[in-house]
């Protein structure tokens, strides 16, 4: 799979930039969507595509036929007060992404979703679940990854919860939830995305949960 074209949305973000760097190091050709004027924020070596992630007509024609489409866009620093943004940005962007992917004839769609069910962030989870439904309905072979929180630079406050997770894993009634909603590192997330990109399912949809994301 090395060298295959990849189209990335969210390439200027926290996960997108390191992922693009990893893909370029593996000799993939990376086309990356960015807002007009933000192209310089993409890693060097990526081929910039200026467009609006909420409007498929602004970027669908720039997706190489047969490429893998990786959708990483989401509301920055999500919290319960951002329910309107989850509908507008998270759901709106995957709606545009699936439409563009179908139009372009992509071979594989990779969607960064979120672990669920979850007892908190219900509006966020609901938007991502609806996004998953759009991916499935597209009919494109797809991989859906479901992390809960990705630890990395500027995103480390959940480290305070690690002792709490350890206790939950010892309790039979909460063990499965603790694993499903566990924390993953940025490096593990990047590696899981690369694996997904380079090993697409022949058909249907593959779901990658937290325990598999943690595998390095």
Where are these regions (language model features)?
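Substrate-positioning beta->alpha
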Residues: 89, 93-96, 159, 180-195
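N-terminal Rossmann NAD(P)H-binding glycine-rich loop of SDR-like oxidoreductase domains
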Residues: 3-26
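NAD(P)H-binding glycine-rich loop region in Rossmannoid oxidoreductase-like domains
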Residues: 38-96, 100-103
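Alpha-helical substrate-binding/gating segment
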Residues: 183-216
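Flexible, glycine-rich beta-alpha linker
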Residues: 143-172, 179
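Conserved sequence/active-site signature of Rossmann-fold short-chain dehydrogenase/reductase
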Residues: 54, 117, 150-152
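Conserved Rossmann-fold NAD(P)-dependent oxidoreductase catalytic core, especially the SDR/UDP-sugar
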Residues: 75-138, 143
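Conserved beta-strand positions in the Rossmann-like core of class I SAM-dependent methyltransferases
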Residues: 7, 31, 143
């Amino acid at each position: 799979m090395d060298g295959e074209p990849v189209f990335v949305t969210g390439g200027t973000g926290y996960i997108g930039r390191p992922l693009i760097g990893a893909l370029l190091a593996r000799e993939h050709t990376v086309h990356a969507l960015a807002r007009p004027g933000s192209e310089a924020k993409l890693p060097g070596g990526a081929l910039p595509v200026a467009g609006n992630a909420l409007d498929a007509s602004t970027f669908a024609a720039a997706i190489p036929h047969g490429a893998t489409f990786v959708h990483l866009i989401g509301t920055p620093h999500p919290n319960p007060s951002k329910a309107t943004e989850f509908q507008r940005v998270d759901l709106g962007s995957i709606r545009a992404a699936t439409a563009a992917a179908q139009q372009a004839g992509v071979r594989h769609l990779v969607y960064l979703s979120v672990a669920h069910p979850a007892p908190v962030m219900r509006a966020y989870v609901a938007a991502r679940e609806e996004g998953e439904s759009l991916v499935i309905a597209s009919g494109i072979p797809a991989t859906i990854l479901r992390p809960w929180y990705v630890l990395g630079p500027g995103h480390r406050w959940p480290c305070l919860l690690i002792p709490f997770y350890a206790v939950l894993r010892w309790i039979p009634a909460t063990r499965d939830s603790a694993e499903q909603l566990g924390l993953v590192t940025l490096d593990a997330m990047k590696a899981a995305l690369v694996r997904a990109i380079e090993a697409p399912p022949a058909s249907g949809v593959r779901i990658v949960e937290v325990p598999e994301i943690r595998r390095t």
